[in-house]
């Protein structure tokens, strides 16, 4: 999976970049044929934002977290995208189970 970590209008530490790469690595097994993962950090109106984008299997998942610091914003975005991925995984499992019986 291609991984991009970008900071717009701000500087981020190497530790935060590594954390973002770890977060993307956790999600790649959940995405069917994961192609690209991106994390974009930004600062607007005094609030830090983190946006996670995952693409794979013809589906794009996007989640944004907003908080006073980038680490917490990344955690919020991680929670949001995890919910999206869990719903997709459950739907895939539900479809195959119905036709199996």
Predicted regions and their residues:
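N-terminal, polar/charged subdomain of small-to-medium soluble alpha/beta proteins
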Residues: 1-101
